[in-house]
């Protein structure tokens, strides 16, 4: 059974993915990881992360996957004893120079996708150095993954959902070249997600069409700096493999990884929950397994750039034209109290709320839950809607906590 590995950028996200079935979580510190712009944890948070995760029977992996220069690698090496004392399970490394020290401190050494592992010979070498697992390159096909995993002496891990990079294994210099902010040190400003115009100065024609027979649609190269043809051709769609769970499991890989430490708790909750349901459905009865279209609909409801299967079955060419979730989260209140015996939450609402509205409640202990309002009371009287600045009781089967945040989910099509 493959491990379902989910991202955690903060304690709310951590709880959200664990509540929705993550077998393991990965996270970064303020330094040493590829999401420097995300809200990361401090080294003093590691013991708390470990303890919370153990309550769910989940493993914990710390990302240290940037390019480490001399001062940084020595600082990280000096911190290994403190990291190990927190009782997390392992480190995700992009520098093989740390494998020996990581293992000597009782931590598993997992090799990052930034190492661009694309063959079994590399895996055999990593095994000799002491690595327990390697994340395979995103640029491999499903057949290549199956063959590599079959020959590998260590565990393999693959990405199954989330953002894809235009550069091989994320080794991009575009952000550094334009802004002096290095993607390889976790500080990418993602200029690839912007619209671009490609110019072809040698051409005598104002518009030159590419002549590749691989692309389904031609793109335009302008020679006159005319931004009529501006597009986001550097921006790939998000990977989504929810329609291919049986094929993924048959590869024999040990871990399925969801990308998204910089994304919201509701993203982590939804994506983790959907893949958990699909994986469990297949494993419970492989012969009778059927793909459920609602899984795709649910994944589309949270932030995405459109979906693609990456390199699993072919070379991807489609670029993302979308950059949003199905819903807008509107901050409408906070939890005042939760009455466990009657399953009622008292909410302080500073916006309109009515029967049929879909809400989301998030908190460090609660994680992220969604609920459709089907019953509300004010001072013991049933109401169908409430106005701003009201305290209202809502029948809620999920336990929530005081000061949890309350959001109303509004479809973008209604805006």
Regions found by a protein language model. Name each.
Residues 1-117, 121, 136-139, 143-257, ...:
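Active-site pocket-lining/capping segments in soluble small-molecule metabolic enzymes
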């Amino acid at each position: 059974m493959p491990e379902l590995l989910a991202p955690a950028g903060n304690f709310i996200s951590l709880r959200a993915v664990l509540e929705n079935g993550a077998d393991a979580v990965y996270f970064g510190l303020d330094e040493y990881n590829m999401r420097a712009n995300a809200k990361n944890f401090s080294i003093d948070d590691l013991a708390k992360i470990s303890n919370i995760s153990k309550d769910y029977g989940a493993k914990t992996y710390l990302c240290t996957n940037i390019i480490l220069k001399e001062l940084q690698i020595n600082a990280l090496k000096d911190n290994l004893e403190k990291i190990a004392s927190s009782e997390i399970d392992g480190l995700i490394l992009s520098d093989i120079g740390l494998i020996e020290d990581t293992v000597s401190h009782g931590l598993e050494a997992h090799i990052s996708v930034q190492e661009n592992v694309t063959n079994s010979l590399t895996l055999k070498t990593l095994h000799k150095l002491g690595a327990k697992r390697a994340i395979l390159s995103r640029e491999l096909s499903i057949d290549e993954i199956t063959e590599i995993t079959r020959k590998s002496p260590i565990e393999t891990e693959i990405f199954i959902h989330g953002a894809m990079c235009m550069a091989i294994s994320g080794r991009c210099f575009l952000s550094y070249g334009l802004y002096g902010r290095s993607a390889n040190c976790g500080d990418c400003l993602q200029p690839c997600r912007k619209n671009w115009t490609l110019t072809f100065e040698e051409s005598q024609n104002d518009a030159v069409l590419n002549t590749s027979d691989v692309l389904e649609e031609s793109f335009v190269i302008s020679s006159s700096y005319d931004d009529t043809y501006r597009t986001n051709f550097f921006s790939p769609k998000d990977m989504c493999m929810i329609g291919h769970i049986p094929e993924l499991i048959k590869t024999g890989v040990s871990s399925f990884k969801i990308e998204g430490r910089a994304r919201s708790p509701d993203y982590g909750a939804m994506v983790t929950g959907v893949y958990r349901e699909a994986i469990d459905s297949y494993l419970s009865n492989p012969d009778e397994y059927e793909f459920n279209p609602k899984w795709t609909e649910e994944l589309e409801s949270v932030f995405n750039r459109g979906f693609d299967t990456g390199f699993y079955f072919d070379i991807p060419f489609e670029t993302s034209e979308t950059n949003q979730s199905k819903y807008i989260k509107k901050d409408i209140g906070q939890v005042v109290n939760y009455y466990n015996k009657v399953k009622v939450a008292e909410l302080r609402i500073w916006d309109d709320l009515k029967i049929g509205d879909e809400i989301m409640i998030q908190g460090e202990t609660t994680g992220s839950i969604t609920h459709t309002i089907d019953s509300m009371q004010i001072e013991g009287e049933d109401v169908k809607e409430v106005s701003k600045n009201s305290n209202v009781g809502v029948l809620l089967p999920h336990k929530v906590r005081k000061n949890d945040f309350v959001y109303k989910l509004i479809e973008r099509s209604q805006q």
